[in-house]
A protein has these predicted regions:
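C-terminal capping/gating helix-and-loop segments adjacent to ligand/active sites or protein-protein/ligand interfaces
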Residues: 351-406
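Extracytoplasmic/periplasmic solute-binding protein
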Residues: 126-132, 137, 164-211, 217-218, ...
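Short, solvent-exposed loop/beta-turn-alpha elements that line the ligand-binding surface or hinge
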Residues: 106-118, 155-159, 181-182, 201-220, ...
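Glycine-centered hinge/linker elements that transmit conformational signals in sensory
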Residues: 170-171, 208-238
Length: 417
């Protein structure tokens, strides 16, 4: 298994025609390719807008099927079994059932400067998928409450707070303003991994012996997480009972919210009773986030080249910048000048946070790809990190027990060829 090296933002980008994806103009007139995805309408319709633009320029129809998220993976799996896969798709994970039917997108990724830290090669040295966009864990503050309390929050890297300093700050805000809670955090292992990374942990790592291990920093992070789930700093009900942290923050009674970039549009549209702001996340020992997003894949078949042409066109600087602006995407290509309008400050902060974060921040996505390419599957939908964290939040067990249970569950469910 090869891992692609991390390159700097200034790495060379090949000329547009170097990989030979684009045809000679109208050669594809009248053709149609099927593109399956989920959530485009809820993200501003960027893919549909680009499909319309592509038709105007080339005469090729990109027929988008926006499938409900809960049905998407099943639809793809059924299509693979019935030999009815679309020509391309934006997926959340790579399914071994159709993994061997993917075209190599390495040329597209290289030509347009997709961040190499996000790429993973299969056993043949190919890149069957790469992220179309990034989501990133991030922090929001109730600016009104912070200002009322006279407490500052960092807006530049030279003023970063640690987790200890951050919790002290939200306690001060809570005491000065009568806010209900200092912090809410999405009940998600994705968010919890980010906190672990910020404590210096690499999380739970699968070794060559097909067994998981972790590090001492994970213990420190989980001890800290347990300590702030005290119904004072954080409400236990979010992790234990499923209370909505988004709604709690939007109530105006919480000083800060540990969530992610996908909240920006919602807050812009739906928070009117107080001022909110994106803030730099705490860094206990290092700066880190946790990256996610949707993967672009092209399936082998009669329309594969036409689909590749569209993907290559989509990731040219002009077109990719346009879809990022329409859909509010954090780009997977560095160095673009994306205009986010009223949300510019928030997205600038997210991009700065990503650029400054340790490489471990992309480990979850990259590792998931490497595992499936290597024939290692986690099995089922189990999420032991979240399950055991719920017990921690509720005071049902200590951290050593939680870690032992997480590793036991991960080991039990992993399959290695």
């Amino acid at each position: 298994m090869k891992r692609r090296l991390v390159i700097t933002a200034g790495a060379a980008v090949l000329p547009l025609g170097a990989c030979g994806f684009i045809g000679d103009g109208g050669e594809g007139d009248g053709e149609t390719v099927k593109f399956w995805l989920s959530g485009d309408a809820n993200q501003g319709g960027g893919f549909q807008a680009m499909a319309d633009k592509y038709f105007e320029e080339t005469g090729v129809t990109v027929d988008i099927d926006d499938i409900p998220y809960d049905d998407f993976n099943t639809r793809l799996r059924n299509a693979a079994q019935a030999d009815g896969l679309p020509d391309l798709a934006r997926v959340t994970a790579i399914d071994p059932i159709w993994m061997d039917r993917l075209e190599d997108l390495g040329g597209v990724a290289s030509e347009h400067g997709v961040m190499e830290s996000l790429l993973a090669e299969n056993r043949d040295g190919e890149v069957p998928a790469f992220l179309t966009d990034l989501t990133a864990v991030g922090l929001y503050v109730n600016k009104t409450l912070f200002d009322q309390a006279g407490v500052a929050y960092p807006t530049a890297p030279d003023g970063l707070w640690t987790w200890d300093g951050f919790i002290s700050a939200v306690k001060e805000v809570k005491a000065a303003t009568g806010a209900r809670y200092g912090l809410v955090m999405d009940p998600s292992s994705h968010r919890l991994r980010s906190l672990m990374y910020q404590f210096g942990s690499d999380g739970f790592v699968l070794g060559d012996d097909c067994r998981y291990t972790t590090d001492e920093a994970a213990t420190a992070a989980l001890e800290f997480f347990a300590s702030i789930n005290d119904d004072d700093v954080m409400p236990r009900s979010v992790w234990v009972s499923g209370d909505d942290p988004n709604a709690l923050f939007k109530s105006g009674q919480v000083a800060a919210y540990y969530s992610g970039s996908w909240q920006v549009a919602d807050f812009q549209d739906n928070i009117a009773d107080f001022e909110w702001a994106s803030a730099l996340m705490p860094a206990q020992t290092r700066r880190a986030t946790n990256l996610g997003g949707g993967y672009m894949v092209v399936y082998k078949g009669d329309k594969a080249q036409t689909a590749l042409d569209f993907v290559n066109w989509l990731f040219t600087a002009e077109n990719y910048t346009e879809i990022c602006e329409i859909s509010g995407f954090l780009p997977v290509v560095q160095g673009l000048d994306v205009d986010y309008g009223a949300a510019q400050a928030s997205f600038d902060l997210y991009n700065e946070e990503i650029a400054a974060s340790d490489d471990v921040s992309s480990a979850q996505e990259r590792t998931a790809l490497e595992m499936v390419y290597a024939g290692r599957t986690a099995g089922g939908d189990a999420d032991p990190l979240k399950d055991e964290a719920v017990k921690l939040a509720n005071g049902e067990q200590d951290v050593p027990t939680a870690i032992a249970n997480i590793i036991a569950s991960l080991d039990e469910n992993i399959t290695c060829e």
